[in-house]
């Protein structure tokens, strides 16, 4: 099969890496890709905003399945367009993607289908939102309604935080039109996990879970990011909790989509808070998480392309997913200044030495090849993944690999998976 992966992150690198291992894979393309992906796939660069460009490429290269990585292309209806032209796509329709692209749609869906989520109110008016925060108990959570690259959530410990959050989102338009509407919800106590399941027209299939570190700095300090690291498994997640997630959240979500005549084909990411009252849905994402994807795919034993092929043909029920029993830790190396302003084009050296450490696989994100060197070209730059018998050993291997890398322009968290080791 000929496969096209759309995207340029470490998530897409890990997807290409996984698909490449499949006996079913004849040729793999990635648009636009990065300096790491181009070593295992044919990378092309053309205007993805024009859907016809994607269609023409698919026809020219006889693409069997398109795998869409980033959420913005799902929001723009790339999946719908290609399917209407008889191209198979792994990734939900524009309508189904509203589970991520509109927090308001997602919260209403959860409420309609009696799936546990935090109590909430939504506002289009800055004045009404300001009046509301004067009457609530803190902490609270303020969320931009639309897509904000994983950074549109603000946890407010007091009224000053909330006023600043409202000003940034609704007045200063920090997230553009994504902040035209906001959600204000109660703060839930507990711990977060990212849970993943494949959905097709007829059934769903559990992939697994990972724990994500969203804050920029150690001890969960600093601003929210797209994710600075992840790990699996967690000593806090028992079989009982997993079953509760499947029965009270995943299945009702599948049933709700079916009831509302929304066909969902692809991976669905459940951002959950595990509280003393059980799991609550914080958010849905309609694609693989990053860095969770890198972590999960290191642990996946089943052929990913077999799963994707079955998924796009509504035959998930034919698949049995097998995961390894080892532990995986993923540490993200980001450009200094991320998630704010950062410099590009700093040279990264000694990656090949880091890759030699036992259990290590390095996935590229914001990297480019320049004058036969690897240089930084984005906020999150590398995902160092490590697989071992325990979290403790996997952590040790990951940080040993990072020490081998020579990059003065980057930073990373030193506590990924620490609480679980």
Regions found by a protein language model. Give the residues of each.
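ATP-binding N-terminal substructure of ATP-dependent carboxylate-amine bond-forming enzymes
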Residues: 1-94
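Active-site nucleotide/adenylate-binding loops and adjacent lid/helix of ATP-dependent enzymes
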Residues: 4-5, 99-183, 211, 235-251
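Short, charged, surface-exposed secondary-structure boundary motifs
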Residues: 38-41, 98-104, 217-219, 359
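Generic C-terminus detector
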Residues: 50, 367-371, 376-421
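Short, conserved charged micro-motifs
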Residues: 53, 161-164, 339-342, 389-396
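Internal nucleotide-binding/catalytic subdomain
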Residues: 156-293
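Active-site "cap" helix and flanking loop/linker of ATP-utilizing ligase/carboxylase catalytic domains
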Residues: 246-269, 285-357, 370
